[in-house]
Amino acid sequence: MKIVVMMKQVANKDAILRINKEGTWIEEGDLSFEVSESDGYALEEALRVKEKLGGEVVVCSMGPQRVKSVIKDALARGADRAIHVVGDNLGQLSPYAAATALVAAIRDETPDLILTGLQSDDYGYGQTGVIMAELLGMPHATIAIEVDASGDKLRVKRELESGWYQWYSMPLPALLTIQSGISQIRYATLKGIMAAKKKEIKEVTPAAETVNRPTHQRIEKIYLPQKTKQTQLLGNGDAKAGAAELAQKLHAEARVF
Protein backbone atom coordinates (compact mmCIF):
# COMPACT_ATOMS: atom_id res chain seq x y z
CA MET A 1 0.00 0.00 0.00
CA LYS A 2 1.30 3.44 -0.93
CA ILE A 3 0.43 6.10 1.63
CA VAL A 4 1.07 9.81 1.11
CA VAL A 5 1.15 12.04 4.19
CA MET A 6 0.77 15.80 3.88
CA MET A 7 2.83 17.68 6.48
CA LYS A 8 2.94 21.41 7.18
CA GLN A 9 5.61 23.38 9.00
CA VAL A 10 4.29 25.98 11.46
CA ALA A 11 5.74 28.30 14.09
CA ASN A 12 6.73 26.65 17.36
CA LYS A 13 3.95 26.76 19.94
CA ASP A 14 6.25 28.37 22.52
CA ALA A 15 7.47 31.10 20.19
CA ILE A 16 6.90 34.75 21.06
CA LEU A 17 4.82 36.09 18.19
CA ARG A 18 5.10 39.56 16.71
CA ILE A 19 2.69 40.88 14.09
CA ASN A 20 4.18 42.24 10.88
CA LYS A 21 3.88 45.92 10.00
CA GLU A 22 1.04 45.25 7.55
CA GLY A 23 -0.95 43.58 10.33
CA THR A 24 -1.71 40.59 8.13
CA TRP A 25 0.58 37.89 9.57
CA ILE A 26 3.40 37.30 12.03
CA GLU A 27 7.07 38.13 11.62
CA GLU A 28 8.75 34.82 10.80
CA GLY A 29 12.38 35.91 10.64
CA ASP A 30 13.45 34.92 14.16
CA LEU A 31 10.99 32.09 14.80
CA SER A 32 11.69 28.42 15.30
CA PHE A 33 9.45 25.97 13.48
CA GLU A 34 7.95 22.52 13.93
CA VAL A 35 5.45 20.22 12.26
CA SER A 36 1.76 21.02 12.73
CA GLU A 37 0.54 18.76 15.53
CA SER A 38 -2.19 16.81 13.75
CA ASP A 39 0.10 16.23 10.76
CA GLY A 40 2.51 14.46 13.11
CA TYR A 41 -0.30 12.13 14.13
CA ALA A 42 -1.15 11.56 10.45
CA LEU A 43 2.43 10.38 9.88
CA GLU A 44 2.28 8.05 12.86
CA GLU A 45 -0.96 6.51 11.59
CA ALA A 46 0.60 6.01 8.16
CA LEU A 47 3.60 4.23 9.68
CA ARG A 48 1.30 1.94 11.66
CA VAL A 49 -0.69 1.02 8.55
CA LYS A 50 2.57 0.32 6.73
CA GLU A 51 3.74 -1.93 9.56
CA LYS A 52 0.48 -3.86 9.32
CA LEU A 53 0.08 -4.14 5.54
CA GLY A 54 3.49 -3.31 4.11
CA GLY A 55 4.10 -0.76 1.40
CA GLU A 56 5.58 2.72 1.28
CA VAL A 57 5.07 6.02 3.10
CA VAL A 58 5.76 9.19 1.14
CA VAL A 59 5.63 12.57 2.89
CA CYS A 60 4.84 15.80 1.06
CA SER A 61 5.40 19.30 2.41
CA MET A 62 5.17 22.74 0.88
CA GLY A 63 7.18 25.87 1.63
CA PRO A 64 10.69 27.38 1.63
CA GLN A 65 13.91 25.48 2.22
CA ARG A 66 13.45 25.56 6.00
CA VAL A 67 10.64 23.01 5.50
CA LYS A 68 13.41 20.45 4.96
CA SER A 69 13.69 20.11 8.76
CA VAL A 70 10.12 18.77 8.97
CA ILE A 71 10.74 16.46 6.01
CA LYS A 72 13.98 15.07 7.44
CA ASP A 73 12.33 14.42 10.79
CA ALA A 74 9.54 12.49 9.05
CA LEU A 75 12.11 10.44 7.14
CA ALA A 76 13.95 9.74 10.39
CA ARG A 77 10.72 8.50 11.99
CA GLY A 78 10.21 5.97 9.22
CA ALA A 79 8.86 7.57 6.04
CA ASP A 80 10.51 6.15 2.92
CA ARG A 81 10.92 9.25 0.77
CA ALA A 82 9.61 12.78 0.41
CA ILE A 83 8.30 15.39 -2.00
CA HIS A 84 9.07 19.05 -1.31
CA VAL A 85 6.92 21.64 -3.10
CA VAL A 86 9.35 24.55 -3.01
CA GLY A 87 8.39 28.22 -2.79
CA ASP A 88 8.88 31.15 -0.43
CA ASN A 89 5.29 32.38 -0.05
CA LEU A 90 3.30 29.17 -0.44
CA GLY A 91 2.18 29.21 3.18
CA GLN A 92 -0.05 32.17 2.36
CA LEU A 93 -2.01 30.39 -0.38
CA SER A 94 -5.74 29.93 0.04
CA PRO A 95 -6.86 26.39 0.90
CA TYR A 96 -8.00 25.82 -2.69
CA ALA A 97 -4.72 27.03 -4.20
CA ALA A 98 -2.70 25.02 -1.68
CA ALA A 99 -4.74 21.89 -2.41
CA THR A 100 -4.28 22.40 -6.15
CA ALA A 101 -0.50 22.68 -5.79
CA LEU A 102 -0.30 19.63 -3.52
CA VAL A 103 -2.49 17.50 -5.80
CA ALA A 104 -0.26 18.38 -8.76
CA ALA A 105 2.78 17.28 -6.76
CA ILE A 106 1.42 13.88 -5.71
CA ARG A 107 -0.94 12.90 -8.54
CA ASP A 108 1.64 10.74 -10.34
CA GLU A 109 2.23 8.79 -7.13
CA THR A 110 -1.25 7.23 -7.50
CA PRO A 111 -1.51 6.69 -3.71
CA ASP A 112 -3.85 4.17 -2.15
CA LEU A 113 -4.31 6.35 0.92
CA ILE A 114 -3.69 10.03 1.65
CA LEU A 115 -3.50 11.26 5.24
CA THR A 116 -3.51 14.87 6.37
CA GLY A 117 -3.89 16.52 9.74
CA LEU A 118 -7.37 17.72 10.65
CA GLN A 119 -6.24 21.36 10.50
CA SER A 120 -3.01 23.30 10.69
CA ASP A 121 -1.88 24.98 13.89
CA ASP A 122 -1.53 28.37 12.20
CA TYR A 123 -4.48 29.18 9.93
CA GLY A 124 -6.67 26.33 11.16
CA TYR A 125 -8.83 26.28 8.02
CA GLY A 126 -9.39 22.51 8.06
CA GLN A 127 -10.19 22.66 4.32
CA THR A 128 -7.09 21.68 2.36
CA GLY A 129 -7.37 17.92 2.82
CA VAL A 130 -11.05 17.81 1.89
CA ILE A 131 -10.46 19.95 -1.21
CA MET A 132 -7.62 17.62 -2.24
CA ALA A 133 -9.98 14.66 -2.01
CA GLU A 134 -12.54 16.42 -4.20
CA LEU A 135 -9.91 17.36 -6.80
CA LEU A 136 -8.72 13.74 -6.90
CA GLY A 137 -12.22 12.29 -6.91
CA MET A 138 -11.54 10.28 -3.75
CA PRO A 139 -13.90 9.37 -0.93
CA HIS A 140 -12.86 11.06 2.28
CA ALA A 141 -13.58 11.22 5.99
CA THR A 142 -12.65 13.92 8.50
CA ILE A 143 -11.77 13.98 12.21
CA ALA A 144 -10.55 10.37 12.12
CA ILE A 145 -9.60 8.96 15.53
CA GLU A 146 -9.22 5.30 14.58
CA VAL A 147 -8.25 3.67 11.29
CA ASP A 148 -8.65 0.00 10.42
CA ALA A 149 -7.12 -0.66 7.00
CA SER A 150 -7.32 -3.91 5.06
CA GLY A 151 -6.37 -4.80 1.50
CA ASP A 152 -8.88 -2.72 -0.44
CA LYS A 153 -11.02 -0.89 2.10
CA LEU A 154 -11.02 1.17 5.27
CA ARG A 155 -13.05 1.34 8.44
CA VAL A 156 -12.74 4.75 10.04
CA LYS A 157 -13.98 6.01 13.40
CA ARG A 158 -14.89 9.70 13.34
CA GLU A 159 -15.24 12.01 16.31
CA LEU A 160 -18.53 13.89 16.46
CA GLU A 161 -19.89 16.37 19.01
CA SER A 162 -21.01 15.70 22.58
CA GLY A 163 -19.07 12.46 22.93
CA TRP A 164 -20.63 10.78 19.90
CA TYR A 165 -18.65 8.74 17.35
CA GLN A 166 -19.37 7.41 13.88
CA TRP A 167 -17.92 4.45 11.96
CA TYR A 168 -17.43 4.74 8.21
CA SER A 169 -16.52 2.07 5.66
CA MET A 170 -15.03 3.21 2.37
CA PRO A 171 -13.10 1.78 -0.58
CA LEU A 172 -9.54 2.67 -1.46
CA PRO A 173 -8.07 4.95 -2.67
CA ALA A 174 -9.29 7.41 -0.05
CA LEU A 175 -8.25 10.46 1.97
CA LEU A 176 -8.53 10.92 5.74
CA THR A 177 -7.95 13.96 7.94
CA ILE A 178 -6.52 12.82 11.26
CA GLN A 179 -7.39 14.20 14.69
CA SER A 180 -4.61 14.91 17.20
CA GLY A 181 -4.20 12.30 19.92
CA ILE A 182 -5.17 9.32 17.75
CA SER A 183 -2.07 7.42 18.90
CA GLN A 184 1.30 7.77 20.62
CA ILE A 185 3.80 9.45 18.29
CA ARG A 186 7.17 7.70 18.02
CA TYR A 187 10.48 9.52 18.27
CA ALA A 188 13.20 9.34 15.67
CA THR A 189 15.96 6.91 16.64
CA LEU A 190 19.66 7.41 15.93
CA LYS A 191 19.42 4.64 13.35
CA GLY A 192 16.47 6.41 11.75
CA ILE A 193 18.29 9.74 11.68
CA MET A 194 21.28 8.17 9.95
CA ALA A 195 19.06 6.33 7.46
CA ALA A 196 17.17 9.53 6.63
CA LYS A 197 20.32 11.06 5.15
CA LYS A 198 20.17 8.54 2.29
CA LYS A 199 16.47 8.87 1.53
CA GLU A 200 15.20 10.75 -1.50
CA ILE A 201 13.74 14.25 -1.21
CA LYS A 202 12.27 15.22 -4.57
CA GLU A 203 11.86 18.96 -5.15
CA VAL A 204 9.06 20.26 -7.37
CA THR A 205 7.94 23.79 -8.21
CA PRO A 206 4.24 24.62 -8.38
CA ALA A 207 2.84 25.98 -11.62
CA ALA A 208 2.72 29.77 -11.82
CA GLU A 209 -1.01 29.74 -12.54
CA THR A 210 -1.57 27.84 -9.30
CA VAL A 211 0.43 30.25 -7.16
CA ASN A 212 -0.89 33.38 -8.84
CA ARG A 213 -4.54 32.36 -9.23
CA PRO A 214 -7.07 34.89 -7.91
CA THR A 215 -8.13 34.15 -4.37
CA HIS A 216 -11.65 34.54 -3.03
CA GLN A 217 -10.49 35.28 0.48
CA ARG A 218 -7.85 37.37 2.17
CA ILE A 219 -6.78 38.16 5.71
CA GLU A 220 -7.77 41.72 6.54
CA LYS A 221 -6.12 41.89 9.95
CA ILE A 222 -4.69 39.76 12.71
CA TYR A 223 -4.19 40.95 16.27
CA LEU A 224 -3.41 39.74 19.75
CA PRO A 225 -6.48 39.45 21.99
CA GLN A 226 -6.82 42.22 24.53
CA LYS A 227 -6.72 41.26 28.18
CA THR A 228 -10.04 42.23 29.71
CA LYS A 229 -9.69 40.49 33.08
CA GLN A 230 -7.07 40.44 35.78
CA THR A 231 -6.56 38.50 38.99
CA GLN A 232 -5.93 40.32 42.25
CA LEU A 233 -4.92 38.65 45.51
CA LEU A 234 -6.83 40.04 48.49
CA GLY A 235 -5.80 40.03 52.12
CA ASN A 236 -2.22 38.91 51.50
CA GLY A 237 -3.05 35.38 52.65
CA ASP A 238 -5.20 36.38 55.63
CA ALA A 239 -8.80 35.17 55.25
CA LYS A 240 -10.42 37.83 57.45
CA ALA A 241 -8.52 40.66 55.84
CA GLY A 242 -9.34 39.25 52.41
CA ALA A 243 -13.04 39.05 53.25
CA ALA A 244 -13.07 42.62 54.49
CA GLU A 245 -11.26 43.87 51.41
CA LEU A 246 -13.62 41.93 49.15
CA ALA A 247 -16.65 43.44 50.90
CA GLN A 248 -15.20 46.90 50.47
CA LYS A 249 -14.59 46.36 46.73
CA LEU A 250 -18.07 44.92 46.19
CA HIS A 251 -19.50 48.02 47.83
CA ALA A 252 -17.26 50.68 46.30
CA GLU A 253 -16.51 49.26 42.84
CA ALA A 254 -19.21 46.72 41.97
CA ARG A 255 -21.88 48.56 44.01
CA VAL A 256 -23.49 45.27 45.01
CA PHE A 257 -24.55 46.64 48.39
Regions inferred by a protein language model and the residue ranges of each:
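N-terminal glycine-rich FAD/FM-binding segment characteristic of electron-transfer flavoproteins
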Residues: M1-F257
